[in-house]
């Protein structure tokens, strides 16, 4: 299909993956390498007065991923997972801003890592835990239109990069559970998405969605 048509063709994917599942004395490790190619990759494209569903010619991605869960002691649990990939529009001739063949799709970081450490303990008869998690993704551009992306970069908002810390502390005794939690405790700030304002003839106004701000909370549960 071309930009502006009502319907998009279905995607056709070809994926090669080779992996292993490894049992550890106190955990496991899953690893895999992959190489995928998607013909008629479906993407939302801005056409001046709105967005339409369009097909890129071919989009490919290759890389590797892993998932590790390990308990070094009876009271400590560790988990870390990661995805490392390179993605590319091999062919995208009919894009709204022109030929995007050879460019990287928006919002596709090369590296994504999630890690968690949990300490389990008992205090005064309360079964308790303390968990800290970290979410990281490397820098990724927000827009695919090179001219629009350049405008955002000039204002210091052209890329998203995540480096977020969360924590949870839980206490359970009999029928009562108490959970204290904090999200984005390091006050990480980034845009999750950005797009040009609809019907802006100058094409210089943009909107964006910020990530969730620092939040704390307390949750109480009682079962009876």
Model-identified regions with their sequence ranges:
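Outer-membrane beta-barrel translocator domains and adjoining extracellular loop/strand segments
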Residues: 1-4, 41-49, 85, 89-98, ...
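Extracellular loop and loop/strand-boundary signature of outer-membrane beta-barrel proteins
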Residues: 2-7, 15, 49-55, 95-105, ...
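Hydrophobic, lipid-facing positions within transmembrane beta-strands of outer-membrane proteins
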Residues: 4, 14-18, 52, 62-66, ...
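Transmembrane beta-barrel outer-membrane domains
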Residues: 9-13, 49, 56-61, 71, ...
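Membrane-embedded beta-barrel scaffold of Gram-negative outer-membrane proteins
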Residues: 9-64, 83, 87-93, 189
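Strand-connecting loop/turn motifs
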Residues: 22-28, 63, 73-75, 110-112, ...
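Gram-negative outer-membrane beta-barrel transporters
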Residues: 35-37, 54-145, 219-223
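C-terminal beta-signal and adjacent terminal beta-strands/loops
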Residues: 135-145, 171-224
């Amino acid at each position: 299909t071309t930009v502006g048509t009502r319907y998009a063709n279905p995607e056709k994917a070809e994926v090669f993956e080779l992996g292993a599942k490894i049992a550890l004395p106190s955990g496991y490790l899953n690893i895999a390498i992959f190489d995928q190619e998607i013909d008629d990759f479906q993407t939302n494209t801005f056409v001046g007065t709105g967005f339409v569903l369009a097909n890129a010619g071919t989009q490919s991605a290759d890389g590797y991923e892993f998932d590790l869960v390990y308990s070094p002691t009876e009271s400590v649990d560790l988990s870390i997972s990661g995805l490392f990939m390179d993605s590319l529009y091999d062919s995208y001739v009919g894009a709204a801003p022109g030929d995007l063949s050879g460019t990287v799709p928006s919002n596709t970081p090369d590296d994504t890592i999630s890690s968690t450490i949990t300490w389990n303990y008992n205090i005064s008869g309360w079964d308790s835990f303390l968990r800290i998690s970290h979410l990281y993704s490397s820098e990724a551009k927000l827009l695919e239109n090179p001219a629009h992306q350049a405008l955002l970069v000039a204002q210091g908002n052209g890329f998203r990069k995540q480096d977020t810390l969360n924590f949870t502390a839980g206490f359970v005794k009999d029928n009562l559970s108490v959970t204290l939690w904090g999200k984005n405790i390091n006050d990480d700030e980034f845009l999750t998405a950005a797009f040009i304002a609809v019907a802006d003839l100058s094409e210089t106004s943009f909107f964006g969605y910020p990530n969730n701000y620092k939040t704390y909370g307390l949750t109480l549960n009682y079962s009876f």
